[in-house]
């Protein structure tokens, strides 16, 4: 039994798979936030500038592209954080697009990190690696995105709506809680702006989140 466990640990180590909070809770989430910031968030900023200053190139050309590429940007960032082989990184672009389409940024995150790890497991294990590795990564990732995505997206939207409604009903206490939580997130290696974007916070809740920054 011990030999089997040792063999399993050695195999996972060889594949660069580390089951730890540091890897999935810090590294992956931090990279996801970077991917989200480099696509959707920066696109939102440029869209606002383009709208206010009447620059159609920013609001009508760059903004739609940046929004559509949010999932792929998140996926590539996560795959690189997990030190995935090139074939897995390239394949994750499709996974990220599907995950974001059906489940938003969180859907892209879950679909990508699971499929990337599976892709790493099969990478270079067969003589037709160029077929097997992308196929495993894409099929598992897109399946996860389409299967789990809608439920994840519904939960995130509902959670965001609950926070905004609660902040409207109890602006002082809920505003304080939201601002404190966002302030705490600022001390972590993830983006507080990305968190607020995932929850679609607006109105009083959005203002409280801004105060927390």
Predicted regions and their residues:
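Pore-lining transmembrane helices
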Residues: 2-213
């Amino acid at each position: 039994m011990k030999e089997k466990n040792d063999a399993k640990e050695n195999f996972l180590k060889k594949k660069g798979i580390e089951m730890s909070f540091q890897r999935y809770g810090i590294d992956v989430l931090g990279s996801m936030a970077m991917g989200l910031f480099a696509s959707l968030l920066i696109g939102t900023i440029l869209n606002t500038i383009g709208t206010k200053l009447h620059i159609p190139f920013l609001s009508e050309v760059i903004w739609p592209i940046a929004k559509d590429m949010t999932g792929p940007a998140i996926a590539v960032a996560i795959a690189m954080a997990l030190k995935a082989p090139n074939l897995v990184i390239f394949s994750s672009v499709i996974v990220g697009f599907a995950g974001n389409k059906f489940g938003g940024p969180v859907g892209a995150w879950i679909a990508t990190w699971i499929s990337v790890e599976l892709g790493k497991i099969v990478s270079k294990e067969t003589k037709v690696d160029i077929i097997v590795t992308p196929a495993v990564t894409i099929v598992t990732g897109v399946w996860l995105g389409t299967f789990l995505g809608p439920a994840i997206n519904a939960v995130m939207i509902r959670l965001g709506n609950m926070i905004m409604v609660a902040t409207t009903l109890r602006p002082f206490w809920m505003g304080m809680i939201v601002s404190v939580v966002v302030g705490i997130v600022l001390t972590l290696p993830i983006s507080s702006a990305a968190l607020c974007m995932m929850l679609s916070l607006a109105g009083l809740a959005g203002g409280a989140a801004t105060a927390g920054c």
